[in-house]
């Protein structure tokens, strides 16, 4: 009997549109001969299932069920592809844990920790992993321009501590731009991260593990036409993405080993993608960890799956079946 899978998309952040695009990608990637697929759209208190005829029906949040043709239907598995809250920060994971519904991503603790960039990077720094110098700023607290310059330096990145898709991120080059950048970042998050600029080659590496296998994908090199890998570069084609990355083999191997190690240190589950920057001397520096990576047709993970010579349908089946 086919399992019924919810592709859970939407969310309560600026990344909603990106998430819905990932849902369409996943709908095309997951094996429809093996699974019954439904996209579940979440936005605030609106939780709806998209039915085969395109109409939408509400989700009963008491048990994550829905009605179709007068029949109550239950989901066997949730593939979470929400970027931002509530799907990337542990909230939905806790909900599904309460209901006993298996899901694709990391658990509550890991999701919450990786969503908090500052906390996650400081934690991994304790394992000897290189990260940029940074500081955290919470709402209600102020920081002077001089403090930023003295502690972090210019240029620097000012960004939401919780969030993705480069919403609210500013590369700050001058003293005059510091406070406006902080205000912009606070529009996306209650905490702002101020991070030192590192000059180098941006790369990203995907990985997943099951009970019987470990897969670390080929690395992608990101060459942005913009100041940094911002929203336009990510989603509007304003970047060149090269898979496999143009790295010396020993550097590439270190990145692959580090990706696998971080997966285990944090206790990740499902597909993750880790962003790095390679600085002078082939130093590998962690940027951030994505536990619900984008899954549009042109996203990094599908690119890396193709470069590895794998079938993405098989990868999706691995992710789902590993939870049963």
Model-assigned labels for residue ranges:
Residues 173-257, 278, 283-285:
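Phosphate-binding site of ATP-dependent enzymes
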Residues 84, 222, 290-304:
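Glycine-rich phosphate/pyrophosphate-binding beta-alpha loops
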Residues 196, 206-207, 263-295, 305:
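Conserved metal-phosphate-binding beta-hairpin within the catalytic cores
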Residues 3-9, 13, 21, 113-201, ...:
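Active-site nucleotide/adenylate-binding loops and adjacent lid/helix of ATP-dependent enzymes
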Residues 37, 102-103, 131, 156, ...:
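Hydrophobic beta-strand scaffold residues
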Residues 1-109, 113-115, 119, 138-146:
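ATP-binding N-terminal substructure of ATP-dependent carboxylate-amine bond-forming enzymes
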Residues 315-324:
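Cysteine/selenocysteine-centered motifs that mediate thiol-based redox chemistry or coordinate metal-sulfur cofactors
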């Amino acid at each position: 009997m086919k399992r019924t899978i919810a592709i859970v998309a939407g969310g309560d952040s600026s990344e909603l549109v990106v998430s819905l695009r990932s849902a369409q990608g996943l709908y095309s990637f997951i094996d429809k001969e093996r699974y019954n697929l439904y996209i579940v759209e979440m936005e605030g208190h609106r939780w709806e299932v998209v039915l085969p005829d395109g109409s939408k029906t509400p989700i009963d949040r008491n048990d994550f069920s829905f009605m179709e043709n007068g029949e109550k239907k239950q989901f066997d598995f949730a593939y979470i592809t929400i970027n931002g809250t509530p799907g990337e920060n542990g909230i939905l994971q806790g909900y599904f844990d309460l209901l006993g519904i298996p899901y694709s991503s990391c658990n509550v603790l890991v999701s919450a920790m990786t969503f908090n960039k500052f906390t996650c990077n400081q934690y991994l720094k304790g394992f000897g992993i290189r990260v940029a110098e940074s500081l955290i700023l919470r709402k209600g607290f102020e920081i002077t321009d001089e403090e930023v310059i003295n502690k972090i330096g210019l240029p620097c990145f000012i960004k939401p501590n919780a969030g993705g898709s480069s919403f609210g991120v500013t590369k700050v080059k001058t003293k005059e731009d510091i406070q406006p950048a902080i205000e912009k970042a606070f529009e996306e998050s209650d905490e702002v991260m101020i991070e030192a600029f590192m000059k180098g080659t941006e790369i990203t590496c995907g990985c997943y593990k099951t009970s019987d296998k470990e897969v670390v994908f080929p690395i992608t090199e990101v060459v942005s036409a913009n100041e940094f890998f911002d929203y336009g570069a990510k989603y509007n084609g304003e970047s060149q993405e090269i898979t496999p990355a143009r790295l010396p083999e020993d550097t590439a191997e270190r990145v692959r080993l580090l990706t696998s190690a971080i997966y285990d240190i944090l206790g990740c589950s499902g597909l993750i993608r880790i962003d790095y920057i390679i600085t002078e001397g082939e130093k590998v520096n962690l940027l951030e960890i994505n536990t619900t990576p984008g899954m549009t047709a042109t996203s990094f993970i599908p690119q890396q799956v193709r470069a590895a010579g794998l079938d993405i349908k098989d990868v999706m089946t691995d992710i789902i079946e590993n939870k049963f």
